[in-house]
């Protein structure tokens, strides 16, 4: 059986915070404001896997008012959902994601981001694609006040 999930996340950019994308700290003058570390890419991936499993969304599993999750590394959240996916006997067939922000240019970081996601999910990096886009200076990503990410994931039930 195959299952598809879509994920999405958005956060405000502010000074004085780290910019975490795919578990990699990207040098920038602004970082992400969020209850956790605000890693929009890992949140979108987590949300996509949750959706593919039919288990709601990321907010259901990790509410933004839970003080135990304050400033938590988003990789921990993704690992928890990855474990649930494995317990349900699913594996990732393909993961395609997009990070949308005006600056900084992310091309130099894409390979390390992809490799880190593969490490977190314990899969081959060839199953993962990460793209970076701008919105041509339009909207909140264009005026550099926010960042967003999308992800689609294809899961396959393992043969017993």
Curated annotation (Swiss-Prot):
Top-level division of the source organism's lineage: Bacteria
Q: Which UniProt keywords are given for this protein, alphabetically ordered? A: Isoprene biosynthesis, Lyase, Metal-binding
Q: Which GO terms describe its molecular function?
A: 2-C-methyl-D-erythritol 2,4-cyclodiphosphate synthase activity; metal ion binding
**Membrane as UniProt keyword:** no
Q: Which GO terms describe its biological process?
A: isopentenyl diphosphate biosynthetic process, methylerythritol 4-phosphate pathway; terpenoid biosynthetic process
Its pathway is: Isoprenoid biosynthesis; isopentenyl diphosphate biosynthesis via DXP pathway; isopentenyl diphosphate from 1-deoxy-D-xylulose 5-phosphate: step 4/6
NCBIfam families of this UniProt entry? ispF
What is stated as this protein's family in its record? Belongs to the IspF family.
Q: Which HAMAP family match?
A: IspF (MF_00107)
Q: What does this protein do?
A: Involved in the biosynthesis of isopentenyl diphosphate (IPP) and dimethylallyl diphosphate (DMAPP), two major building blocks of isoprenoid compounds. Catalyzes the conversion of 4-diphosphocytidyl-2-C-methyl-D-erythritol 2-phosphate (CDP-ME2P) to 2-C-methyl-D-erythritol 2,4-cyclodiphosphate (ME-CPP) with a corresponding release of cytidine 5-monophosphate (CMP).
Task: Name the chain's protein.
Answer: 2-C-methyl-D-erythritol 2,4-cyclodiphosphate synthase
Upper lineage is: Bacteria, Fusobacteriati, Fusobacteriota, Fusobacteriia, Fusobacteriales
